[in-house]
């Protein structure tokens, strides 16, 4: 009820006066209030959320539960202010997938601005509970976003139940927490830089000066944060942070090294300009961090690193570990047995153009599952890889159940999307020229 009262109040406000008549301070109050309304996980939703009716696809997170179910979370709507989350699952090790099971769509036509959910992750904790982290912001990004989580205690049941969303703090979480040898749970949280703000959406209602001043109070803390829980997720504390040069969404991952240090890797740059996988180290459990430095050349895009049961690390990235591909292609997996100093093997997962955002997990039987998306606007497909360390070291699938390029999601109306139509028109125009 409170949510509807707020929505009606904003609707009335904007129905009685133009957007341009509102003050900068009033915009901030409205946007902050809209971002703080808890985004609900919906189980009873309109048929437009069925896979056959979706028109976009971007992978977010994938995770296995104690009973063997694999959950998938992806973005529908677009990589913009139209974004929302859809979840489904597989009960046969990723071979077949259900239709949409849950939706997080905070959009409301009665609101003066679009409100989206676009960043998050799935994670099974040591207690067997499935977590869903997800953010919320107004427009694409107005300089701030709120970070939330819900927990499912029965993720393998026919009708899993999610807890009410709980506010975590300002920012967003794209990659999984890490459980340290000390028992600490360590969660990466990013407060995006100002260069991601939706000026194209807000330029008609804010002056340049106001835009530059928006959410200025967050400027000193924009960057890659480390949240820590000492009580198995009951509470979280922002322990420390670092700021990357040329930041682009941060997208950081935190690994505990054999010598006890914490190793953070992240994303920087735009395209191939100032880009790479960046790294920073903490010797005091995340309170302070070394000056960030480039770890490996890499196109500006998400990478994936996690610790395996063997003690080795697996990394999935674009191209060889010593190259920066010109486009998002050649997703390749490597193994390190010396905490990331060197990498071995090299299993090419996919050499298609415009593939991105690998994320994954290791199952108890040793198989490593990684999902990624393909041409989000034009095809919107999500693929799954199942492999072992031996496959990666051999450079080919040698395990009996391993596979590459297995399609797990294809939106039914991607060709009719606004973005796809615009792309085809632009492509046709360029060919004419």
Per-region residue spans from a language model:
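Bacterial N-terminal signal peptides that target proteins for export
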Residues: 1-7
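Bacterial N-terminal signal peptides
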Residues: 7-17
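Asp-box/BNR beta-propeller blade signature and adjacent active/binding-site loops
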Residues: 22-433
């Amino acid at each position: 009820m409170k949510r509807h009262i707020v929505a009606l109040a904003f609707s009335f406000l904007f129905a009685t006066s133009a957007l341009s008549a509102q003050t900068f301070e009033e915009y901030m109050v409205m946007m902050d209030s809209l971002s703080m309304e808890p985004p609900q996980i919906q189980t009873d939703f309109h048929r437009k959320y069925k896979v056959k009716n979706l028109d976009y696809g971007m992978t977010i997170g994938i995770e296995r539960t104690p009973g063997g179910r694999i959950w998938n979370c992806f973005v529908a709507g677009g990589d913009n202010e139209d974004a929302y989350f859809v979840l489904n699952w597989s009960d046969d090790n990723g071979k077949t997938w259900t239709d949409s099971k849950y939706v997080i769509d905070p959009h409301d036509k009665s609101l003066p601005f679009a409100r989206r959910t676009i960043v998050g992750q799935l994670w099974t904790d040591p207690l067997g509970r499935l977590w869903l982290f997800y953010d919320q912001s107004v427009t694409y990004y107005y300089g701030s976003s709120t970070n939330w989580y819900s927990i499912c205690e029965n993720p393998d049941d026919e009708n899993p139940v999610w807890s009410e969303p709980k506010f975590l703090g300002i920012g967003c979480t794209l990659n999984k927490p890490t459980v340290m040898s000390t028992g600490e749970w360590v969660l990466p949280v990013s407060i995006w830089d100002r260069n991601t703000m939706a000026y194209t959406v807000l330029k008609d209602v804010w002056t340049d000066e106001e835009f530059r001043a928006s959410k200025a109070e967050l400027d000193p803390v924009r960057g890659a944060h480390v949240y820590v829980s000492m009580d198995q997720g009951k509470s979280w504390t922002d322990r420390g942070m670092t700021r990357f040069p040329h930041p682009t969404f941060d997208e950081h991952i935190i690994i505990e090294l054999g010598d006890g240090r914490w190793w953070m890797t992240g994303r920087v740059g735009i395209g191939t300009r100032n880009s790479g996988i960046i790294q920073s180290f903490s010797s005091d459990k995340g309170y302070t961090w070394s000056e960030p430095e480039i770890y490996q050349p890499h196109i500006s895009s998400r990478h994936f690193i996690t610790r395996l049961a063997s003690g080795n690390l697996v990394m999935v990235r674009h191209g060889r570990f010593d190259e920066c591909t010109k486009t998002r292609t050649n997703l390749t997996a490597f193994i390190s047995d010396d905490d990331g100093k060197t990498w071995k093997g090299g299993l090419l997962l996919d050499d298609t153009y415009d593939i991105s955002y690998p994320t994954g997990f290791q199952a108890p039987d040793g198989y490593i599952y990684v999902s990624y998306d393909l041409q989000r606007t034009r095809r919107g497909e999500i693929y799954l890889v199942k492999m072992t360390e031996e496959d990666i070291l051999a450079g080919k699938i040698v395990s009996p159940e391993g596979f590459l390029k297995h399609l797990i999601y294809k939106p039914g109306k991607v060709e009719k999307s606004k973005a796809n139509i615009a792309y085809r028109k632009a492509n046709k125009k360029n060919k004419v020229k």
